[in-house]
C-alpha cells in the first residue's frame, strides 16, 4: 500500500501548483474529495475554531490535532497536510508529534517559527524564535520521521516581522536543516513569492 507521504509527493509532482484545500472535519474532507481536489489541509485554526469554538492561540494539544486528523484520514484517501503549530514542545515532543501524525495516516505537516505561545498567522504582533531554534525544530521533526516519504514543511511568519529578505534568509536555513518544503505565511500577492 502506498504511504500517505508518497501520495502527497506524487500530488505535488503531478499538479503544479498543487491546490491543497482546507477541510476541518471528515464531512468537509469527503466533499473536497468528491469535488476533485487532490490533497487536504487541516489548519491549527481549523482545529481550534471548528472543534472547540476557540481562537487560534496555542490552546489545542497534540491529542486534539491527532484526533481530528484521524477522523479525516479514515474518511478519505486524499493525502492530508496538518498544521502542527510549533510542534507541541521541545525536540523530543516534536519527534513524538511526527510519529503520532504518521500513525494517524497524515501525509505531511508544517511546523512554524513562532514562539511557543503563538498567534494565528494573520494576526499582528507575532514573535518568532531565532533561525537556530527553528532549524532545531525541523531537525527534530526529520529525526522523528519513520517514513522517509512523510513530508515536512517549514512555515515562516517572518514576512510580517522581518520583510521578504528576512523570510528568504530564514527559508534558506530551513531547507538546509532538512525541510522538504516551505510555507511563507501571510504573503498577500503571488508576485511576491516568485523567487
Predicted regions: what is each one?
Residues 19-22, 40-42, 80-84, 109-111, ...:
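Hydrophobic faces of well-ordered beta-strands that scaffold small-molecule active sites
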Residues 193-195:
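Conserved small/polar residues in nucleotide/adenosyl-binding loops
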Residues 30-49:
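N-terminal glycine-rich anion-binding loops that anchor highly charged ligand groups
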Residues 48-65, 114-134, 164:
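Glycine-rich tight-turn/loop motif centered on a GG-T
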Residues 12-27, 58-59, 82-93, 127-129, ...:
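Active-site mouth loops of central-metabolism enzymes
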Residues 25, 32, 83, 105, ...:
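Conserved, mostly hydrophobic/aromatic
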Residues 180-190:
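Catalytic beta/alpha-barrel core
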Residues 1-22, 31-34, 139-143:
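N-terminal amphipathic alpha-helix/helix-capping segment at the start of soluble metabolic enzymes
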Amino acid at each position: 500500500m502506498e504511504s500517505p507521504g508518497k501520495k502527497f509527493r506524487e500530488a505535488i509532482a503531478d499538479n503544479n501548483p498543487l491546490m491543497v484545500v482546507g477541510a476541518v472535519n471528515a464531512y468537509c474532507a469527503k466533499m473536497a474529495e468528491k469535488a476533485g481536489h487532490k490533497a487536504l489541509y487541516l489548519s491549527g485554526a481549523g482545529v481550534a475554531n471548528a472543534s472547540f469554538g476557540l481562537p487560534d492561540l496555542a490552546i489545542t494539544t497534540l491529542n486534539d490535532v491527532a484526533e481530528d486528523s484521524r477522523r479525516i484520514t479514515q474518511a478519505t484517501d486524499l493525502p492530508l497536510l496538518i498544521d502542527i503549530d510549533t510542534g507541541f514542545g521541545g525536540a523530543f515532543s516534536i519527534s513524538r508529534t511526527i510519529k503520532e501524525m504518521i500513525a494517524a495516516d497524515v501525509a505531511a505537516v508544517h511546523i512554524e517559527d513562532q514562539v511557543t505561545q503563538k498567534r494565528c498567522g494573520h494576526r499582528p504582533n507575532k514573535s518568532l524564535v531565532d533561525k537556530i531554534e527553528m532549524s532545531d525544530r525541523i531537525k527534530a521533526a526529520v529525526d522523528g520521521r519513520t517514513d522517509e516519504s512523510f513530508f515536512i514543511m517549514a512555515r515562516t511568519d517572518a514576512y510580517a516581522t522581518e520583510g521578504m529578505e528576512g523570510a528568504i534568509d530564514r527559508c534558506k536555513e530551513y531547507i538546509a536543516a532538512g525541510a522538504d518544503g516551505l510555507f511563507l505565511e501571510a504573503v498577500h500577492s503571488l508576485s511576491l513569492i516568485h523567487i
